[in-house]
């Protein structure tokens, strides 16, 4: 009975902490240390008490190991500018409270037992679910910013809808490639899904690169044949592909150029404040200062194009980083000095800190009630393929 109370109390505190952290992150842009540090201590205390009551020291040992491990992982991601410090400490707090999957709910749906558990520790399930929950939250958040303060980005966002003809042509080309793939694989002594997918991709690329008139004739002939063989499947397939292509293009727009513009502001050095996050790191090479936000893939492309591999290993000496912790007062003074000396322009791209705590809260709820979303997706893929 007491063990159940400890488990219920741990879940309640974790949910309450994540809820308050979400409110604070949205309202003030921070997750306060006065929340996370006491919760970490309380989690270790509760699991220590549980270990004593069950006469199993490994409960506390695993709790300490998982808590330290999640903090170390979070610290690495913080150094990589993926997470803010408050996010790291909130994940650590949840881990100290819930190092193992709580057995609060248990039900079955369509022959599957829920919540679905994974072979790895429960805190990793919370992290994975939080990351997956971030995508819909990011879409809603960015769209809200566009609608309220960046209306000029709406035209760019709606561009895929205006290109509905291009999307329809691509849907017809893919349908033609799928039809040809089925015809070809019927003559093969074996059926391999990966081979079929590769063949669909290659045929789509080949047909897309044909001259317009030849492409129109080939696609028309194949589509007519496909309609003759299975009218309903062909029509529904084309419509689903068309809608899917449009939705993917909308999401791609929202997550690339639109997000970059919506979640960044341009400011002068006198407008900079402590805690603001630069969009890119400031580097120095010799007497030259420059901002560089290129990814590793971008640098690989540049190296392949120019033959200069030095950019892969050395971009210069970091002067002011784009860490998620934000600018410090001394870094602002460094930027002010460089501007006054004419070394850099008085123009800085500042990232709006997107609150991650709500995604952590949603990820925790999903983990408790539904289970590991990654495992569910893997099972769905096994069923489909």
UniProtKB/Swiss-Prot annotation:
Q: Which residues cross the membrane?
A: 1-21, 29-49, 58-78, 80-100, 104-124, 126-146, 166-186, 187-207, 231-251, 358-378
Which locations, inside or outside the cell, does it occupy? Cell membrane
Q: Which Gene3D superfamilies match?
A: 1.20.120.1220
Give the EC number(s) under which this enzyme is classified. 3.4.-.-
What is the topology of this protein in the membrane according to its UniProt annotation? Multi-pass membrane protein
**Where does the source fall among the domains of life?**
Archaea
* Keywords assigned by UniProt, alphabetized: Cell membrane, Hydrolase, Membrane, Protease, Transmembrane, Transmembrane helix
What InterPro entries does its record include? Pept_A24A_C_arc (IPR009639), Prepilin_IV_endopep_pep (IPR000045)
Q: What GO molecular-function term can you cite, just one? A: aspartic-type endopeptidase activity
What Gene Ontology cellular-component terms does the record carry? plasma membrane
Spell out the Pfam families in the cross-references.
Answer: Arc_PepC (PF06819), Peptidase_A24 (PF01478)
The family this protein is said to belong to:
Belongs to the peptidase A24 family.
The role this protein plays is:
Peptidase that processes the N-terminus of prepilins.
According to UniProt, the name of this protein is Prepilin peptidase EppA
- The organism named in the record is Methanothermobacter thermautotrophicus (strain ATCC 29096 / DSM 1053 / JCM 10044 / NBRC 100330 / Delta H)
Lineage of source species: Archaea, Methanobacteriati, Methanobacteriota, Methanomada group, Methanobacteria
Q: Which gene encodes it?
A: eppA
């Amino acid at each position: 009975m007491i063990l159940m109370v400890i488990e219920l109390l741990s879940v309640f505190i974790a949910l309450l902490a994540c809820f308050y952290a979400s409110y604070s992150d949205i309202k003030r842009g921070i997750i306060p240390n006065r929340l996370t540090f006491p919760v970490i201590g309380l989690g270790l205390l509760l699991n220590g008490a549980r270990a004593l009551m069950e006469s199993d020291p490994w409960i506390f040992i695993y709790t300490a190991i998982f808590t330290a491990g999640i903090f170390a992982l979070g610290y690495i991601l913080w150094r990589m500018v993926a997470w803010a410090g408050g996010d790291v400490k909130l994940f650590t707090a949840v881990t100290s409270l819930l190092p193992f999957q709580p057995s609060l709910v248990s039900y079955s749906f369509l022959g599957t037992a829920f919540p679905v558990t994974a072979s790895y520790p429960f805190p990793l399930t919370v992290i994975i679910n939080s990351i997956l929950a971030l995508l819909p939250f990011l879409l809603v958040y960015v769209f809200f910013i566009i609608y309220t303060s960046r209306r000029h980005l709406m035209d760019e966002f709606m561009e895929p809808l205006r290109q509905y003809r291009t999307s329809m042509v691509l849907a017809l080309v893919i349908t033609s490639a799928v039809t040809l793939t089925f015809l070809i694989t019927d003559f093969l002594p074996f059926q391999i899904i990966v081979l079929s997918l590769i063949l669909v991709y290659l045929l789509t690329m080949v047909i897309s690169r044909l001259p317009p008139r030849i492409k129109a004739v080939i696609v028309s002939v194949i589509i007519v044949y496909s309609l003759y063989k299975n009218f309903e499947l062909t029509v529904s397939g084309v419509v689903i592909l068309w809608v899917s292509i449009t939705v993917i293009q909308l999401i791609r727009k929202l997550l690339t150029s639109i997000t970059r513009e919506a979640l960044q502001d341009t400011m002068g050095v006198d407008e900079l404040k402590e805690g603001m996050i630069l969009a890119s790191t400031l580097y120095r090479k010799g007497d030259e200062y420059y901002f560089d936000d290129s990814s590793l893939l971008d640098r690989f492309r540049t190296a392949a194009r120019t033959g200069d591999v030095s950019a892969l290993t050395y971009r210069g000496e970091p002067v002011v980083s784009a860490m998620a912790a934000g600018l410090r007062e001394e870094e602002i003074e460094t930027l002010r000095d460089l501007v006054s000396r004419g070394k850099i322009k008085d123009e800085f791209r500042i990232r709006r800190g997107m609150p991650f705590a709500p995604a952590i809260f949603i990820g925790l709820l999903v983990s408790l009630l539904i289970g590991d979303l990654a495992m569910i997706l893997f099972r769905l893929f096994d069923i489909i393929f």
